Each structure stands twice: as structure tokens, then as C-alpha cells.
């Protein structure tokens, strides 16, 4: 999932990664970029969107204060320039002129008021944005979001004039630009928002764009396999028709069944896979990059596995073997297999075992084989019945959200390479926290890390937080995942961001 936390990024690590991630060849933009995406987004409202698939649309149709350049550096975008006060609490932004909103029958200049309205929506408890807590660094944001303060105008975001925005913080945060490059920090035009009458972000005609493209068509029918797609076309108010640095449009196909063959015949401009068979077939023919940005691990039902020793006992007997796309992992934060493997202290063998265990995992052939081998190990070692289930994607996600599992295999990825980006998945208020347990101790450790200005002390907090999860068996890492991204001829001007899981057109 995406758009949950963007703090405390290690800039040097980001530069090293992005230095080789771009398939950005400049050339004729007189083409339409086409690619497959996984899953239909529930919304394109930047303040509430979570799905990876929405990132492909949002990051090409919206411009925030900060964005990414072709090397992956976080750079000013809508912010033409900015200054920071001596105490680090006030950030003042001068916005670019000549940037416009566009939707059918609507156009308007993008101004500082659009950012104020967006941040107020984000923090407003009535909106119930899962990303609100990430922005508690804004003055009064936490009080407003938790209901102890009700006046939204007291939020530390102010439009000084049409082109000047002032943001006031609760505490200094030198990594604020990383946060402001996130989806949740994208602007929102209040006038257009009101015209959607509660349907903002839910259909193509309920999305206004201040970016290079706008949503022309959003077609989705859950009973159809070939009518599910997005069509983005150039927002000519922001990018001239004769600008050839980026495509003239984009088509994203939702859950395309023949994505690999569509890439091979030149229909798609890029293709992502973790299939060993496809990698072997494509690697000698196309340019590609690899990204190890996700870790898979086990989470346990909090009722059936309330005993930490029981969780650790099962985790101890769970070992995945290495392959091209999956490597054994024992850490939650990257690098996932760095240093010594954690050896948790186990009690005597008198732990009461459940008679049977059901494991839920997403559909994945290679991981299925690994998980079945682990299930057999549990049967042999513990003398229990163990079954592995692979429901459809939507059912799998529903079971995770409702806690309908004994053990679940889940994927954790960060929105950047920082430790916070991964560990924040286990915060009590995180929609990615599938452990079913809310730990005030863990929340306090991460909150301390977030506010700590000393890098060494901050790192010690992160180590403490990760050790807490591992030693209590709340999350048991089993393997990291490497994605292969192949680029075809029709990908000029496009870059791939592995943390956002998105193809982005960058001038």
C-alpha cells in the first residue's frame, strides 16, 4: 500500500537507488504510454487514497509542493522557492504561477488556498484519512484530528496571498519536503470539490487535475476482464500540445491478463514481474532494473496467538529458500538480510499448541510452494493440522482487515527507503497493521524517533522499535521481494518509482 508515511528519509540511500531506476530516455513524446496496474483504486482523492494502483494516476495528474526529478531526487515542484525560519518551525513557500486546474467544464488557477483546503481536509477527523497522523508535525494537527480542538483555521497552514503559503510546525523537521512530496499533501480546489457532492475522487468527472495529465476515462466492471482501464490525456493548460518531453497520454489497464505478451508485442511500454520464467525470457531482450523494496512475513491472529512464545515457536520453524526474486530475510527494514539473524529467547517446549492452523496468503505460485513447505514443517514438528489458502485479491484483503485468519503471509513495503516508512506499518492507527495488536510502547518509540533531531539517537529508537516487533513475534520476516521492471521502446520520458509503485512522466 502507499501514502502512509514519508518521514526521516536517508537521502544518500535514495539517491543511490534512484540513480538507476529511471527508464527516462528523452525523445518524441508523440505517443501514448501504456502499462498494466494491479487492482482498481477505491478512490483518486489524494487525501484518502491508499492503493498502489492509485499512485500511477495521482502522481501524473496532481502536483504538490515537492515532487521528483528524473534522478529521483525530491525537488520543489509547485513550490518555486521556499525559506525556513531560524528555529525550523516556519516554512514559507512561493508558488509557481501559470499552473491550472482542469476537468470537464472546469478550470481555475492553482493557488495557496488549494493547499490550505487540502491540509484541512486531511486533518479533519470527519474525513477519516489514514494518512492524517503522518502530518501531526503540523501545528495543532494532532489536537484537531483527535477532537480536542475543533477550529480547522488553527491548523498551521496559511495562505498569505495567492502565491505564498506558510506552514508552521510543532517541532523542527528537516525532512518535511519528503512528506510534502506525498500524495496526501497534494492540493485540492474547494470550488471543484463542492461540485462533486460527496463523490470527489470516485469517478473521472469527479477529479480535477493540476498536473500534466487529467483523467479522461475511468472504466471498471468487476465482472469484466477487458473493460477495466484508465485513460489520461494531457492537461494542455499546463503542458503545451507540442511538448515532446513526455507522452501525449497514458493508458493504464487494470489487472491485464496478458500483460507480458502485450509488452512483448510493443503494446505496453513497460512491464513489472517477479516471475522467474518471465524474467528469464525477457532479460536478454529488454532493458530492465531491479528493486528490492518489500519484505514478506507472518502475522498471527491476536486471539489464537496471544502468547508471544507461541508466535516465536511458529516463526522459528518458518524458513524460505532463496531464488531470483525472493531472498531469505530476517529484518523488517532494508537491507532485509543485513547482519546477524535475530535469535529470540524461547521458553521450554510445554507451550500449548493449537490443534489446527489455517494460513491465508495472496495468490503467488512461488510463494505458495514455499508456504506449503513451511506448513509441512509445522505439521511434522508440532503434530498439528495446517492448511494454506489463497483467496482472490479482494477476499484476501478483506480477511486481513477483518482478522479472519490464524496466520497470514503479508507484504510490507515502504514509501521510501527510511526505517520509519517500514516500521510505521505497525503503528496502532496504521491501516497496514495486520497484527491485530495496538502497542502503546511501540507507538511511543516511533513517536520519539520522529521528533528526535540527533541522527544517532533516532537510529537507536528505530533499532529498539524493530527489535520489539521481532522479539515479540508480532511480525516474522521470511523473505524479501525483488521486482524486475522492463522498459520497451514506448517509454520515453517515463520513470518508475519503486516505493510508490508508479510510472511517472517527468519533464
Where are these regions (language model features)?
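Short, well-ordered beta-strand elements
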Residues: 30-39, 90-93, 115-118, 165-166, ...
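N-terminal lobe/hinge region of extracytoplasmic solute-binding protein
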Residues: 36-86, 208, 499
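Aromatic- and charge-enriched surface segment that lines or borders ligand/interaction sites
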Residues: 81-134, 306
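Gly/Pro-rich hinge or "lid" segments in bacterial periplasmic/extracellular proteins
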Residues: 152-153, 162-163, 168-245, 257
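Ligand/substrate-recognition segments at binding pockets and active sites
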Residues: 224-227, 351-414
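Ligand-site clamp/hinge motif
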Residues: 231-280
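Detector for C-terminal structural segments
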Residues: 315-341, 366-375, 400-507
Amino acid at each position: 500500500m502507499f501514502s502512509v508515511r514519508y518521514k526521516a528519509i536517508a537521502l544518500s540511500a535514495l539517491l543511490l537507488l534512484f540513480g538507476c531506476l529511471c527508464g527516462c530516455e528523452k525523445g518524441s513524446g508523440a505517443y501514448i504510454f501504456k502499462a498494466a496496474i494491479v487492482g482498481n483504486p477505491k478512490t483518486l482523492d489524494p487525501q484518502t487514497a491508499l492503493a498502489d494502483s492509485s499512485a500511477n494516476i495521482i502522481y501524473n495528474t496532481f502536483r504538490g509542493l515537492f515532487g521528483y526529478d528524473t534522478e529521483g531526487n525530491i525537488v520543489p515542484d509547485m513550490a518555486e522557492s521556499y525559506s525556513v525560519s531560524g528555529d525550523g518551525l516556519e516554512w514559507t513557500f512561493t508558488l509557481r504561477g501559470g499552473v491550472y486546474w482542469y476537468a470537464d467544464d472546469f478550470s481555475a488557477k492553482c493557488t495557496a488556498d488549494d493547499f490550505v483546503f487540502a491540509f484541512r481536509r486531511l486533518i479533519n477527523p470527519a474525513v477519516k484519512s489514514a494518512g492524517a497522523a503522518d502530518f501531526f508535525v503540523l501545528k495543532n494537527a494532532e489536537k484537531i484530528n483527535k477532537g480536542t480542538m475543533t477550529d480547522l483555521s488553527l491548523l498551521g497552514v496559511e495562505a498569505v496571498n495567492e502565491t505564498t503559503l506558510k506552514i508552521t510546525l510543532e517541532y523542527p523537521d528537516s525532512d518535511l519536503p519528503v512528506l510534502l512530496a506525498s500524495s496526501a499533501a497534494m492540493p485540492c480546489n474547494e470550488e471543484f470539490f463542492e461540485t462533486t457532492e460527496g463523490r470527489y475522487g470516485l469517478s473521472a468527472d469527479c477529479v480535477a487535475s493540476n498536473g500534466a495529465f487529467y483523467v479522461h476515462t475511468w472504466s471498471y466492471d468487476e465482472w469484466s476482464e477487458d473493460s477495466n482501464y484508465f485513460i489520461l490525456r494531457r492537461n494542455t493548460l499546463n503542458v503545451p500540445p507540442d511538448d515532446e518531453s513526455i507522452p501525449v497520454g497514458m493508458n493504464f489497464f487494470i489487472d491485464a491478463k496478458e500483460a507480458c505478451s502485450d509488452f512483448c508485442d510493443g503494446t505496453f511500454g513497460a512491464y513489472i514481474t517477479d516471475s522467474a520464467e518471465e524474467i528469464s525470457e525477457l532479460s536478454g531482450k529488454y532493458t530492465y532494473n531491479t528493486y528490492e523494496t518489500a519484505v514478506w512475513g507472518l502475522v498471527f491472529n491476536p486471539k489464537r496467538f496471544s502468547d508471544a512464545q507461541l508466535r516465536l515457536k511458529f516463526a522459528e520453524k518458518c524458513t524460505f529458500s532463496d531464488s531470483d526474486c525472493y531472498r531469505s530475510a530476517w529484518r523488517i527494514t532494508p537491507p532485509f538480510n543485513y547482519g546477524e539473524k535475530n535469535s529470540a529467547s524461547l521458553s521450554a517446549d510445554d507451550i500449548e499448541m493449537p490443534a489446527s492452523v489455517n494460513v491465508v496468503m495472496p495468490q503467488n505460485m512461488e510463494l505458495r510452494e514455499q508456504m506449503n513447505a513451511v506448513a509441512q514443517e509445522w505439521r511434522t514438528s508440532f503434530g498439528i493440522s495446517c492448511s494454506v489458502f489463497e483467496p482472490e485479491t479482494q477476499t484476501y484483503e478483506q480477511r486481513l482487515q477483518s482478522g479472519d485468519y490464524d496466520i497470514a503471509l503479508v507484504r510490507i513495503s515502504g514509501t521510501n527507503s527510511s526505517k520509519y516508512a517500514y516500521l510505521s506499518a505497525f503503528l496502532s492507527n496504521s491501516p497496514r497493521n495486520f497484527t491485530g495488536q495496538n502497542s502503546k510502547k511501540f507507538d511511543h518509540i516511533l513517536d520519539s524517533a520522529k521528533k528526535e533531531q540527533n541522527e544517532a539517537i533516532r537510529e537507536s529508537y528505530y533499532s529498539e522499535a524493530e527489535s520489539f516487533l521481532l522479539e515479540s513475534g508480532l511480525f516474522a520476516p521470511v523473505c524479501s521481494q525483488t521486482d524486475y521492471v522492463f522498459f520497451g521502446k514506448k517509454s520515453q520520458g517515463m520513470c518508475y518509482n519503486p516505493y510508490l509503485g508508479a510510472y511517472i512522466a517527468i519533464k
